[in-house]
C-alpha cells in the first residue's frame, strides 16, 4: 500500500540559545542549523524511513530552499513527482530553542 501525504513543507531555521533575549538584546552564543520542516514533509520522510512507499503532494518555491527540500525528501525515499514548483518563496520557519523548549 502506498502512503500519500498532502501537506506543507518548509525549511526550519533553528537557533539554539542559552537564554531568550530581552527586548533590544542580541544573544551571541546561538548555535544555528537548518532542517526539513512542515507537517506534511516530516510525515512523508518518517513514513519513508520506516519503509513505506510514499508520495508527497504539495508545493515548494522555485528557489534554493525548494531544491533543498526536494533533495532531502528524495534522499529519504519520498516520491516528489507530485510536488509543484510555484512562483512564491519556499516557506521558512524561524525557531528559537532555549533549554530544550521552542
PLM features: what roles do these ranges have?
Residues 72-88:
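A glycine-rich helix N-cap at a beta->alpha junction
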Residues 85, 95-102:
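Conserved phosphate-binding/catalytic loop of the ribokinase/pfkB sugar-kinase fold
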